[in-house]
Amino acid sequence: MTKLTYYTATTLDGFIADHNDSLDWLMRQENDEDGPLNYTEFIEGIGAIVMGSTTYRWLLEHQPGEWAYEMPAWIMTSRELEMPGAPADVRFASGDVRPVYDAMAAAAGGKDLWVVGGGELAGAFADAGLLDELITYTAPVTLGRGRQILPRRILPAAWPCSGI
């Protein structure tokens, strides 16, 4: 069964991006490829991804060159995006996340789905009852303000705690 995971990093004070929507704090963190949050192992099981337009724009602007993802990607946006040089397998969508989930699941070829970011988008999937798993890495950093990991109340959480 395909599952949707919000796999993300957060600061000690609960932010995924700073007040300028930057992920620079995250790019300075070491990645433990042998630990429980092994990205390489995680991404091998992913068949489609979804992210908000702010995450998408940041990735294009700050990681120029070849698109980092080989699987189909959906970009959720409430505004018109003009992105010259957008990767070939990127689709833009807005509104209800349910049809996007269905399209992602169909395209994933039996693999899992990943909410890359941000927190508001992950919350929309949770509100729709579609978010199956939350995996977080907490970095030893504080930002004081910025984009929250989940900027809304989500109850009841049916996610078991598998490690701290």
Which residue stretches match the model-derived regions?
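Enzymes that bind and transform nitrogen-containing heteroaromatic metabolites
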Residues: 1-164
